[in-house]
Amino acid sequence: MIPIDRHLLFLINHEWTHPSLDRALGTLSCLDFWMPLLVLGAVVLVWRRGWVGIACVVVCGMGVLTNETLVAQPLKKWTARPRPYQSEEGIRRVDLAQGRPRLFSIVKPPAVEVVAAPDRRGAGRSFPSAHTLNAMTLGLVLARFLRQRLWWLLPPLMAWSRVYTGSHWPSDVLASLGMGFLLTQTVLWVAWRASRRGVPPFTHAAPFLAPGGARPSLT
């Protein structure tokens, strides 16, 4: 374990904390909360933007599928790196409160537990962070298609949340940000090449896929 990795973990997970951050970052890190909203957002995007919306959803799907099947799951099995709460005492595990549907748990106090002893059950799945990989994909693709740079904030916020909630080491998320950027740029390049060859739905989104195309605005 790199000393600075452990030091940063305890700063973010223990020192730089606040009840409002527990709620905000615990919610951001909870996939069950966001899944119905992601589906709804995809439907609205297709309804509002037509073929361009379909292309955006397809590119996001390609990126997430690439992240999960070619990178995240194979590397998790190969490295078997324990999560912080599996290897360190005193880790704060922060999560959205339990409930069904999870969406309604936003009104409940977040679940915060201090791990007295490492929980070594289960295989280590800390590296890489799939949440961070996929957040990078969504952030870059949505910034490109919606032309809003604010989406660029999603990847670093997700990376922060994964360390804050005790789910990953800082080195996990930093490496995942880099890998996610390279993988997403590759997927965007493949989609752009497909648009040049007349492959639908990418042909309808060529201006958004072209390298050096229209730059997103700040809003």
Set out the residue ranges of the language-model regions.
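Alpha-helical membrane-inserting segments
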Residues: 41, 66, 70-71, 75, ...
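Hydrophobic, aromatic-rich transmembrane alpha-helices
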Residues: 37-48, 135-141
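Membrane-embedded catalytic cores of phosphoryl/pyrophosphoryl-handling enzymes
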Residues: 101-219
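N-terminal transmembrane-helix/juxtamembrane module of multi-pass inner/ER membrane proteins
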Residues: 1-40, 71-119, 206-219
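Interfacial segments of alpha-helical transmembrane regions
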Residues: 42-74, 147
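Short helix-capping/hinge motifs at transmembrane helix termini and TM-loop junctions
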Residues: 48-49, 79-80, 165-169
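Short, aromatic-rich membrane-interface segments at the entry and exit
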Residues: 31-35, 52-56, 148-152, 170-173
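Transmembrane helix-bundle signature of multi-pass membrane transporters/permeases
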Residues: 61, 92-96, 177-178
